[in-house]
């Protein structure tokens, strides 16, 4: 048995946890540079605010409808996600972090001691008590069915946030799959939905009843696996440890367009520094660094330019100094004057779990002495808050930094911003 825990309106809910005055108030969270709506509380949804709606359209409604608006506070959301994970891990045999607001839980053995539905309510109540966040829980014999059950928690409020699909309630499974559009099935995207609809497969139940050999021949083994999962055959196991990453990308759209190379150099240094930090977090070394820059594709009255350059490293490294230097060399290859750049980024690839390699006799770059100790010290200094110690090349408070004009405090990651309790 599997359970899928999904935090309701996660970003908006995190903002409400530390602001009790916002209870039952409409709250929205904006994307990078305060561009568009990426999260809505139920009250905001009721006002007709759409996911992805541009901020300038919502701005007109803000005062009239008394909507509370926040810029994305990723440090807060990540911290709250980790807290939810910690609660679930303390109560469950094994947990897989599927996304920042979704976690799969292995219930093997649990159902012998307690009803899955009762256990789901216990999980829900404990998370609410310890974090202040409300979640829905879908329980089923496969991960795909658990996803469908979780979808049902939002459609069937009478179940109080927990829907269990077990062998004892087969009729509930059939009813749910008959109501769920095939496009809502886990792993079925828009294009696949169109093809299935053309064949008369419009619901999850119709997909479950499809011939597996036909699905495999005309679609893929992956969709065949989905069909088997919908029929209660578990084909997808729990991933307690995420698979090793093949690449790491760190990029942002700029708050202000960049036209000066020095400013672009600062941005690339910052992105390379962050990418190197992530690389060390993965306990990997890289042998390839890519820097890319681009103008806005929507600025039709401005010249358009996009380019990327790759730097190969003779020795695998996780040292920020090597990665920053390589990223800046790549920038020199792609930089062109006369453009208004809106985005840049650094990508690391060609990973190896070890930095050991045989240097060539005539290699200009030799292994750095005490590199790992220095990087470990740097990461420990920055552990309680990113950016305590940084490389001078990234500058201080640059104008191109991402706009977050309505950013909430970092309640859980900065000592100076911990909320004060009053009695």
Residue spans for each PLM region:
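Gly/Gly-Pro- and Ser/Thr-rich, intrinsically disordered tail segments characteristic of DNA damage-repair
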Residues: 1-228, 237, 365-423
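Short, charged/polar surface micro-motifs in flexible loops or helix N-caps
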Residues: 10, 33-36, 296-299, 351-355
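Short Gly/Ser/Thr- and Asp/Glu-enriched loop/turn motifs at secondary-structure junctions
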Residues: 98-102, 140-143, 284-288, 339-343
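Short, hydrophobic beta-strand segments
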Residues: 103-109, 308-314, 358-363
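Short, charged/polar, Gly/Pro-enriched secondary-structure boundary elements
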Residues: 111-114, 156, 300, 352-359
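DNA-contacting surface of Y-family translesion DNA polymerases
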Residues: 184, 194-340, 356
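C-terminal hydrophobic structural anchor segments
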Residues: 322, 328-384, 389
